[in-house]
Amino acid sequence: GKSTLPGHLLDFSIGQYDTYTPIQISQYINTIANGGSRLQPYLLKEVYESSKENKEGFGTKIYEASSKELGKVDVEEKYLNRVKEGFKAVVSYGLGTQYMGSYQSIGAGKTGTSQSFIDTNKDGVVDTETITTSFVGYAPYDDPKMSIVVISPDVADASAETTSGIDKRLSSEIVNKYFEIYK
């Protein structure tokens, strides 16, 4: 924003009024996990032909996505490592425990909560305050193999049990399943 009012400056300093897509949030966490290298995201990793001999298996690989570096964050490694240590602390013994499922000890991440407002009866008037909760993380901490972004928009029940419970259940099940498949 362009406002210089003291209250607005405080809001801006913590990211209030900023909006990001899940892909942008994913790039953010992956840039940190990758030591400051910002990589181009892709949604499809590999494509295989069907196997004629084995109905359960894969045939020949016909496509594999390649990594492309889009840029490098200009920051000293010690500062980037400090952020990573903070992310590790969040899931190890902070408010982010249980978000990494059975892999809490090897993960890193960040929780988030923001105010949101909606028009509940579609009359053009924003009439209800809600919150949007989020969790973003990666694992393993020392050699990242996966990352996750969970965003729960417009949660009406602002109790801590409800808000964090949604993201915890989703992220922990996804992380557990990932490591079950890719041991």
Model-derived regions: residue spans:
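Active-site beta-strand/loop architecture of penicillin-binding DD-peptidases
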Residues: 2-69, 78, 84-183
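HHCC-type zinc-binding knuckle of retroelement integrases
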Residues: 72-73
